[in-house]
Amino acid sequence: MPAQPSGYRPEMPGLSYNNNMKGWGPELCARRPDITMAMVDTFLTNMYGGARADFVYTVTRDFVRNCQTPILVLPDDVPGHPYAVAMETVHLAPNAQVSFYPWKDTPDKIPLAVRHIRTFLRAHRPVAAARSMAAAAQ
């Protein structure tokens, strides 16, 4: 599974909450009258606050340590995707690989990153799918 972890940046602690309260939340409420900004606030506070407020927002370090799924991390260092979080994920996940960084700063690097992603996905294709493709090729 290729990943670019979205996580906490200590020098910008309210970044994700504030961005979503300004952008995503009002747009969601406009499309869904059954959802209020108070509900959005509760959701975002749960997502970006508390125990998750120092790592990847959607999982814990213990989850990553125990994750047996192969992952390919493509580090970045933009506000919502801190380099430190990406590299900690690589160190914690037992079946993690890391791509090169920076990988999207110049157009000539993007094809290399895409090649790395494709190679990773081919190497970790589920067995049943690989057998089907091999049988189809014969």
Residue ranges and their predicted role:
Residues 1-11:
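Active-site nucleophile loop of the alpha/beta-hydrolase fold
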Residues 61, 87:
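Active-site phosphate/pyrophosphate- and oxyanion-stabilizing loops and adjacent acidic/basic residues
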Residues 64-68, 91-94:
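Short, conserved loop/helix-junction motifs that constitute active-site signature segments
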Residues 94-138:
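Catalytic active-site module of serine/aspartate enzymes centered on a nucleophile-bearing elbow/loop
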